[in-house]
Curated annotation (Swiss-Prot):
MF term (GO), any: potassium channel regulator activity
Domain notes from UniProt: The presence of a 'disulfide through disulfide knot' structurally defines this protein as a knottin.
Effect caused by changing residue 12 to E: No change in ability to inhibit Nav1.7/SCN9A, and gain of ability to inhibit Nav1.2/SCN2A (IC(50)=919 nM)
Record keywords, A-Z: Amidation, Disulfide bond, Ion channel impairing toxin, Knottin, Neurotoxin, Potassium channel impairing toxin, Secreted, Toxin, Voltage-gated potassium channel impairing toxin
Name of this protein: Kappa-theraphotoxin-Ps1a
Record PTM Isoleucine amide, positions in chain: 29
Function: Potent and specific blocker of Kv4.2/KCND2 (IC(50)=5 nM) and Kv4.3/KCND3 (IC(50)=28 nM) potassium channels. Acts by altering the gating properties of these channels. Also shows moderate inhibition on human voltage-gated sodium channel Nav1.7/SCN9A activation (IC(50)=423 nM).
Disulfide bonds: 2-16, 9-21, 15-25
Species annotation: Paraphysa scrofa (Chilean copper tarantula)
Locations listed in the record: Secreted
A Pfam family this chain is assigned to: Toxin_12
Main localisation: secreted
């Protein structure tokens, strides 16, 4: 489940900005 504060693509949270989850995740940093 993605929350708006989970704006990272790490193994623990698996979320990205815009509440888009791991499938569409692009790791930028």
């Amino acid at each position: 489940y993605c929350q708006k504060w989970m704006w990272t693509c790490d193994s623990a949270r698996k979320c990205c900005e815009g509440l888009v989850c791991r499938l569409w995740c692009k790791k930028i940093i």
